[in-house]
Protein backbone atom coordinates (compact mmCIF):
# COMPACT_ATOMS: atom_id res chain seq x y z
CA UNK A 1 0.00 0.00 0.00
CA UNK A 2 1.39 3.37 -0.98
CA UNK A 3 0.84 6.48 1.08
CA UNK A 4 0.87 10.12 0.07
CA UNK A 5 4.09 11.96 0.83
CA UNK A 6 3.96 14.68 3.44
CA UNK A 7 6.33 17.58 2.80
CA UNK A 8 8.26 15.04 0.71
CA UNK A 9 10.15 13.95 3.81
CA UNK A 10 8.61 10.53 4.45
CA UNK A 11 11.38 7.99 4.79
CA UNK A 12 9.19 4.93 5.22
CA UNK A 13 5.47 4.30 5.31
CA UNK A 14 3.47 1.39 6.64
CA UNK A 15 -0.16 1.11 5.59
CA UNK A 16 -2.94 -1.18 6.66
CA UNK A 17 -6.67 -1.39 6.03
CA UNK A 18 -8.74 -0.25 8.99
CA UNK A 19 -12.48 0.10 8.66
CA UNK A 20 -12.32 1.29 5.06
CA UNK A 21 -9.84 4.18 5.18
CA UNK A 22 -6.15 3.40 4.91
CA UNK A 23 -4.24 4.36 8.04
CA UNK A 24 -0.68 5.24 7.16
CA UNK A 25 2.17 5.81 9.54
CA UNK A 26 5.10 7.69 8.07
CA UNK A 27 8.34 8.56 9.74
CA UNK A 28 9.75 12.04 9.19
CA UNK A 29 13.09 13.53 10.15
CA UNK A 30 11.76 14.74 13.47
CA UNK A 31 9.62 11.73 14.34
CA UNK A 32 6.50 9.73 13.47
CA UNK A 33 3.34 11.24 12.07
CA UNK A 34 0.03 9.63 11.26
CA UNK A 35 -1.98 10.45 8.17
CA UNK A 36 -5.23 9.10 6.81
CA UNK A 37 -5.82 8.77 3.10
CA UNK A 38 -8.56 7.14 1.03
CA UNK A 39 -7.74 4.80 -1.83
UniProtKB/Swiss-Prot annotation:
Belongs to the plant LTP family. GO terms for molecular function: lipid binding. Keywords: Disulfide bond, Lipid-binding, Transport. Plant non-specific lipid-transfer proteins transfer phospholipids as well as galactolipids across membranes. May play a role in wax or cutin deposition in the cell walls of expanding epidermal cells and certain secretory tissues. The keyword Lyase does not apply. This is Non-specific lipid-transfer protein. It comes from Musa acuminata.
Amino acid sequence: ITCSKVYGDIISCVGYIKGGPIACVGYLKGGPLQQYVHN
